[in-house]
Amino acid sequence: MDNPQALPLFLLLASLVGILTLRASSGLQQTNFSSAFSSDSKSSSQGLGVEVPSIKPPSWKVPDQFLDSKASAGISDSSWFPEALSSNMSGSFWSNVSAEGQDLSPVSPFSETPGSEVFPDISDPQVPAKDPKPSFTVKTPASNISTQVSHTKLSVEAPDSKFSPDDMDLKLSAQSPESKFSAETHSAASFPQQVGGPLAVLVGTTIRLPLVPIPNPGPPTSLVVWRRGSKVLAAGGLGPGAPLISLDPAHRDHLRFDQARGVLELASAQLDDAGVYTAEVIRAGVSQQTHEFTVGVYEPLPQLSVQPKAPETEEGAAELRLRCLGWGPGRGELSWSRDGRALEAAESEGAETPRMRSEGDQLLIVRPVRSDHARYTCRVRSPFGHREAAADVSVFYGPDPPTITVSSDRDAAPARFVTAGSNVTLRCAAASRPPADITWSLADPAEAAVPAGSRLLLPAVGPGHAGTYACLAANPRTGRRRRSLLNLTVADLPPGAPQCSVEGGPGDRSLRFRCSWPGGAPAASLQFQGLPEGIRAGPVSSVLLAAVPAHPRLSGVPITCLARHLVATRTCTVTPEAPREVLLHPLVAETRLGEAEVALEASGCPPPSRASWAREGRPLAPGGGSRLRLSQDGRKLHIGNFSLDWDLGNYSVLCSGALGAGGDQITLIGPSISSWRLQRARDAAVLTWDVERGALISSFEIQAWPDGPALGRTSTYRDWVSLLILGPQERSAVVPLPPRNPGTWTFRILPILGGQPGTPSQSRVYRAGPTLSHGAIAGIVLGSLLGLALLAVLLLLCICCLCRFRGKTPEKKKHPSTLVPVVTPSEKKMHSVTPVEISWPLDLKVPLEDHSSTRAYQAQTPVQLSL
């Protein structure tokens, strides 16, 4: 009987034996799955030295072969009882959980090795591939054992049970080798079998697939069947003496089945050995467990290179292909990136025909563009590391149409124009790879030396530099040429600023407004704003005139002239006003020769009014070489070399025009002081003074005499000492004195006009008194307060006595020499009057001005009161 025919017969016999064994032992043992087992001892792990609480269910034994793992918490399989079957439980099975800190043996499917970037030497040919799914934990309430379980596929089947993976509420927590383990077991769930994640092995190495935990070989006997896909590789009983039922003839040479532990090994792995391996554990037909292993077989990482090594193409070409040499099937996963960014997902996602796509070991770039100029990298990655190779792709293009830009050291917007005299720079740029060669064609054909390059400098441009400039760009790689033109405009701003004025027309019946800004290239455009409707206000070049009928409503209305030029836009404003509050102000200035120049300025006389000047009622005729002259607008009269003997007197001005008239007059007098005061300060003297409106003064001299002049003695100018010289606008001065011995000082103020002294002020004497100390000041304050207190007490006593005297009625006879009563009450209250007796003769030093008054005047003679 061959192996395929013997396998079903063996399965049937194993099921019958398991059922009979189960029924025979159902009355001998009972297990309460809802009770919790407490651990009363600790067992030391053989490999790690970890203390694990031992769990002692009745008559459980752990075979010696299960203790080979480095850290184990073993729980023997229990027999199945009818009580358990009647409660919808197919039975419980216990598994060995092996852990070694956080790392297991290299061949264990549970081990998880972090993937490194490059593995030039592979020391372990079999490593678990990274599992992107997170691990889960299983917790059983009774056994108080915990460990970390990686992701695995596990199915448990029992013909007579209602067990499902949803019934398990399991949690296993991985701890360090020195930590303690605890586990709890639910009464309604059995401990699950577990396997590791996907395995990765190199070609020629051994694939080892273990069963973890190792099934209990005790009765009933377990049957293990290994498959790859639907093909049976090996089948046999689990245990040292169990028969081997089947072994795949095609893999007999390199296939080994360890029946003691259920481990399947395939030596000299090839690429076609990759796939999903399944292990089925059948125990007498009562339960069935399925373990799945995903195995990947890889060749060693190859040496890579990209061909061509320096790829070049032009923008708009049909295609460009890059090949990753050294890669082949089974050598890992191939991917492409551009400047470190993955290409496949970004380029092909959502595109019907992606412009970049991978075809085998090649990268195809359809219709390359300039942005494809980058560094391309092919990368091969496997669980054993990765390798990569790169190449720089050059995409030539251009030139694009050149762009000419203008910059000037004076102009903010030179693209429209540049001002004459400025330094102008022309720059030409054209997008091109490789960079394009730039040449210029100037507007001036007489210019022979034209420099090559992207920048053209035009220093101090003038009208001759205006015109058209051409920039030519040529790509030496593609052979293409492009040309662009620029029209350069050179503008010359008119000098100065626009000037506005208004004057009266003939007979003061109209107002004539004028705006001018001559010169410049091109000429400025002038236009009035604010004129009444119907008046022509421009625009006109250079000079603009406008006549408006005179009307009082024009007074105070600003008229603006807007002057536009290529370089700048400027304005000037004139406001016609009627004369109002005309006032003359004298101004004094001193020349270098010491002469005084007096100017009379008329305020409140705006244009279009005209000023007419007169002295003592006679019109003045300035000019003609005389000392009198007028300002340009006629509102200021200048009198040169002013003389106190000839030029003093009355001056007047009359402002008249189309909008009204007004005037003012002033009397010019020599320098003098109208009044002044001398105040005392600490270690200083303070002087303040005033002058009259028409007084002409160019400076003030503060003069002093240290000891003061004798009474009746006349003093000259030389006897006084000048302490300070102040300007004509000053009206006060502070003169510091010696702090220790200030003494007696005599001060006066001398006004001066040019070099001509005026009338000095009256002299005042400054006497410095003794300065009180802080103690004296405090004594004065305290004495004042005490005096006020005594005065208040005396006043209170007087009030009390007065109230007492008023309460008594005197019955004494009237004295014949009684004076007028102090208080004159009405006739009905004569009993309250107190007479005053004075000894004669009475010498009154206070005159009695009004005898009818009710006031009583106090005399210096003794006064006797009748009580």
From Swiss-Prot:
Chain segments carrying region Disordered: 35-60, 104-186, 602-627
Membrane topology: Single-pass type I membrane protein
Tissue distribution: Expressed in the esophagus, particularly in the suprabasilar layers of the epithelium. Expression is largely reduced in esophageal metaplasia, dysplasia, and adenocarcinoma lesions.
Compositionally biased intervals (Polar residues): 137-153, 173-186
Basic and acidic residues biased stretches: 159-170
Record field: compositional bias (Low complexity): 35-45
Effect on the protein of changing residue 631 to G: Found in a family with Barrett esophagus and esophageal adenocarcinoma; uncertain significance
Residue spans crossing the bilayer: 777-797
Signal sequence interval, chain numbering: 1-27
UniProt keyword annotation of Transmembrane present: yes
Parts of the chain on the Cytoplasmic side: 798-867
Protein name: V-set and immunoglobulin domain-containing protein 10-like
Disulfide bonds: 324-378, 428-471
Extracellular compartment spans: 28-776
Compartmental location: Membrane
Keyword Repeat: yes
Keywords tagged on the record: Disulfide bond, Glycoprotein, Immunoglobulin domain, Membrane, Repeat, Signal, Transmembrane, Transmembrane helix
GO cellular component: membrane; nucleoplasm
Entry-linked Gene3D superfamilies: Immunoglobulins
Pfam families, alphabetized: I-set, Ig_2
PANTHER family associated with the record: CARCINOEMBRYONIC ANTIGEN-RELATED CELL ADHESION MOLECULE 19, V-SET AND IMMUNOGLOBULIN DOMAIN-CONTAINING PROTEIN 10-LIKE
SMART domains: IG, IGc2
Glycosylation sites: 32, 88, 96, 144, 423, 487, 641, 650
